[in-house]
Swiss-Prot record:
It is an enzyme of class 4 (lyase). This is Aspartate 1-decarboxylase. The keyword Lyase applies. Is synthesized initially as an inactive proenzyme, which is activated by self-cleavage at a specific serine bond to produce a beta-subunit with a hydroxyl group at its C-terminus and an alpha-subunit with a pyruvoyl group at its N-terminus.
Amino acid sequence: MQLSLLKAKIHRATVSHSELNYEGSIAIDGLLLEAAGLYEFEKVHIWNVTNGARFTTYAIRAEHGSGIISVNGGAARYVQVGDLVIVAAFAQMSEDEAAVFRPNLVYVNAANAMTHTNHSIPTQVA
């Protein structure tokens, strides 16, 4: 059986640009792309924390260290500059692979500078 697990997440990034007439995609600061282990043109899910919108697109590289998170093309209609978003990607793997797999979790500040990384999420308590 193949399972779909969270591969990577960039948590609560701030949309810095929104380019409706640019060819589709989300441009992500190259430093964040690498820290998350995301590839250019990889399918990513975007979850807008600010307005609840959810959509998929593909990642492209923005300038390394620029802090750019730019939602482009038709997807630009789902965000506004300043919105908080989560960028996530999933990977298919066997049960044996899933038993030892840990995702790349990247956390950023309001300027989209990486603050820290992790490979697990704390247990939620009441």
